[in-house]
Regions:
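Conserved S/T- and glycine-rich ATP-binding loop of Class I adenylate-forming
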Residues: 24, 87, 213
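Short, solvent-exposed loop/turn segments at secondary-structure boundaries
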Residues: 57-60, 116-120, 197-200
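Aromatic/hydrophobic pocket-lining residues that form the small-molecule binding cavity
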Residues: 31, 125, 206
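Metallo-beta-lactamase
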Residues: 81-170
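Active-site HxH/HxHxD metal-binding segment of metal-dependent hydrolases
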Residues: 1-79
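C-terminal regulatory/interaction regions
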Residues: 173-230
Length: 230
C-alpha cells in the first residue's frame, strides 16, 4: 500500500526527475516495493555497502545499486546536499541523512518520533547517537512517528542517550536486588501498563543492555542468568 501511495504522489507531482533513491537500512518496511519504485523513477539506489548485495538481488539490474561512502555528500537536482552518516545500532547497515542547509536530520529508525527504537547492538547505537549529536539540527524527520520540530528536535538525540543510560542503571539496580532472569528484570524496569504486544520488544531491549554490560566487563553470564562482576 505504501508503494502505491508513493508512486501516486510521484505522478501527481508530474513525475519529476529523481537523481537517487536513498535507503536508510534493509528492514522490509523500508525496502519493500523498491523494485517497483526504481522501475518507475529510473534512478540509482544508494545504500550502505553491507546492504548493496541484498538490494541488488531485488532489482532487475544489480548495477543500479551504488554503495555510499561514510560521510559522502549526495547532491540533488536542485543542488541540495545531503550527507550520509553511517549509524549502526538499530541495524548494522543503517544510514541517517543530514541536510545541513535546513538543519534537518533524517534519522530512519535510529531515532523515532514518539518512542524508542529496537536496538541490535547497544554499543554501536550509543556511538551513533553521539555522532548525530555532533551535527547541529533543529528538526528530526524519523521513519516512524511525527516529525519533531524545534526546539524539541535539537534535544531528541540527547534524550535518547539519557534514556538508554537510565535503562542501563535500572538493570544494574535489578541485578543488585538479586534478579537474574530477563523476564524478571523486564518486570522490574518496565511499567505494569506495558502493552502485551510490546513485551517481546521490551525483553529484547533488556537482553541488548545485558550484552553491552558483558562487553563492558560489568556483568557475567552463568547459563541463562546474569550477575554483577565481583
Amino acid at each position: 500500500e505504501w508503494t502505491r501511495s508513493i508512486l501516486k504522489y510521484y505522478r501527481l507531482l508530474g513525475s519529476p526527475k529523481i537523481t537517487s533513491i536513498l535507503i536508510t537500512h534493509g528492514h522490509t518496511d523500508h525496502i519493500g516495493g523498491l523494485d517497483r519504485i526504481q522501475e518507475e523513477v529510473q534512478a540509482p539506489v544508494r545504500c550502505h555497502p553491507k546492504l548493496a548485495n541484498k538490494l541488488g538481488k531485488l532489482l532487475s539490474c544489480p548495477e543500479l545499486v551504488i554503495p555510499l561512502r561514510s560521510d559522502e555528500f549526495i547532491t540533488t537536482g536542485g543542488r541540495i546536499k545531503l550527507q550520509a552518516l553511517f549509524t549502526p545500532g538499530h541495524e548494522i547497515d543503517h544510514i541517517c541523512y543530514y541536510l545541513e542547509s535546513d538543519s534537518v536530520m533524517f534519522t530512519g529508525d535510529t531515532v523515532l518520533g514518539a518512542s524508542s527504537t529496537s536496538v541490535r547492538d547497544l554499543t554501536d547505537y550509543l556511538n551513533s547517537l553521539n555522532l548525530l549529536k555532533n551535527y547541529k539540527h533543529e528538526i528530526v524527520c524519523p521513519a516512524h512517528g511525527p516529525v519533531v520540530l524545534a526546539p524539541q528536535g535539537a534535544d531528541l538525540v540527547n534524550w535518547q542517550i539519557q534514556h538508554r543510560l537510565k535503562r542501563e542503571n535500572q538493570i544494574i539496580e535489578a541485578l543488585n536486588k538479586g534478579l537474574r532472569q530477563v523476564p524478571e528484570i523486564t518486570d522490574h524496569i518496565y511499567p505494569t501498563t506495558l502493552k502485551q504486544g510490546l513485551r517481546p520488544s521490551a525483553e529484547r531491549n533488556v537482553m541488548t543492555h545485558l550484552e553491552k554490560l558483558i562487553k563492558d566487563g560489568k556483568i557475567k553470564k552463568i547459563t541463562s542468568k546474569f550477575e554483577l562482576q565481583s
